[in-house]
A protein has these predicted regions:
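Anionic group-transfer/hydrolysis microenvironments
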Residues: 38, 62-64, 110, 149, ...
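Flexible glycine/acidic-rich beta-alpha junction loops that bind and position SAM and/or redox cofactors
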Residues: 65-69, 112, 144-160, 190-201, ...
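Flexible, glycine/charged-enriched surface loops at secondary-structure junctions
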Residues: 138-145, 182-190
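Charged (often Lys/Glu-rich) extended helix/loop segments that serve as interaction or gating elements
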Residues: 171, 177, 184-332
Length: 332
């Protein structure tokens, strides 16, 4: 809203929206709520009634798909905290259709992130279209929209599989055409391309503080770590590292890239092959345009990092570095 986005185009996600969240979205005319439970549907209905608004909703389904990705970013399996199982969904849909201040406009699902195989996307479509067919037969309900989520991958290292997103979308488009004809169901389709359109647009620069070896491992310590990028700590997500101030140096070492937090697990990478470094060198971590700045914290009282945008060869600061006072400004 502060960025002057059209409110009607906003989709309000989250598996546990508070009453404050719901009221804020409704009174600011958010286009859709992605409802995660019957409790949430009831809350949306009750709050919408106070504003005399019939709120549009997509119901998040859990199709029970294994997307063959890291378990911590697998969001569409039967044990996921997200969404409503297909076995429970019919009763929830029936209730949603009875709520006077809810407009159930369709369904949403998202099976996970960094999915390098097309099969899980196609399997999910088969399952959800079959489900929609059954719902039409039993409840007479046809969705206006189906949001199939995202999960389209990016390559963080050369070891990641080669991908062609055009092939993904062609396969998904062909499958949609097939299923619409089979089931005679034709909802508008939404997708969430997410990191696949922004990850490669960013990199993170760190300054080397020290380089040391303990006889078993080499360590490069940097002025950041899990407080600004927790992905390796959380999922052992791998990155490509480059010595930015001397990229052509062909003398390589193997080292762990260590952060400055008080955790032995505060690493950005292990056994990384990188040019020899010394104190003051700059290391670039590539492909951090998604899930880096948005995941940073003040853990260990580390300052938030600045973000610099490059446009037409010009630099523009779009996020300022936190000052020490910024770390304390909410403390009484």
């Amino acid at each position: 809203l502060k960025g002057h986005m059209e409110p009607s185009k906003l989709h309000y996600h989250g598996n546990n929206k508070s009453d404050y969240d719901i009221e804020y979205g409704i009174k600011n005319h958010a286009g859709y709520f992605i409802a995660d439970s019957l409790d949430e549907l009831t809350a949306i209905n009750n709050i919408a009634a106070r504003y005399n608004i019939r709120q549009k909703v997509l119901l998040r389904l859990t199709p029970g798909i294994d997307p063959h990705t890291h378990k911590k970013v697998s969001t569409g399996n039967t044990t996921s905290k997200f969404g409503i199982s297909l076995s429970d969904a019919p009763s929830v849909i029936k209730e949603a259709l009875s709520l006077p201040d809810i407009m159930l406009d369709g369904f949403h699902y998202h099976i996970g992130s960094q999915i390098f195989e097309i099969t899980p996307f196609l399997d999910a479509l088969d399952i959800v279209f079959d489900f929609m067919h059954k719902i039409n037969d039993t409840l007479g309900y046809l969705p206006s929209y189906l949001d199939i989520g995202g999960g389209f991958p990016v390559r963080y290292t050369d070891d990641d599989p080669q991908i062609n997103l055009e092939d993904y979308f062609k396969a998904i488009g062909n499958k949609l055409d097939e299923l619409k004809n089979i089931h005679n169901i034709n909802p508008g389709i939404m997708i969430e391309p997410g990191r696949s359109i922004v990850a490669d647009a960013g990199m993170t620069l760190y300054t080397v503080g020290s380089y040391k070896t303990n006889g078993l491992k080499n360590y490069i310590s940097i002025d950041g770590g899990m407080s600004d990028n927790p992905r390796y700590t959380l999922y052992e997500s791998r990155y490509t590292f480059v010595k930015a101030n001397d990229a052509d140096n062909d003398k390589y070492i193997k080292a762990d890239i260590a952060g400055r937090c008080c955790e032995s697990g505060d690493l950005l990478g292990e056994d990384v092959i990188i040019s020899e470094v010394k104190r003051g060198d700059i290391i670039a971590v590539l492909t951090t345009g998604a899930y880096n700045y948005s995941m940073q914290s003040h853990y260990n009282q580390n300052q938030g990092l600045p973000v610099i945008m490059i446009c037409d060869g010009k630099l523009k600061t779009v996020v300022k570095r936190d000052s020490l006072d910024d770390l304390l400004h909410n403390q009484l």
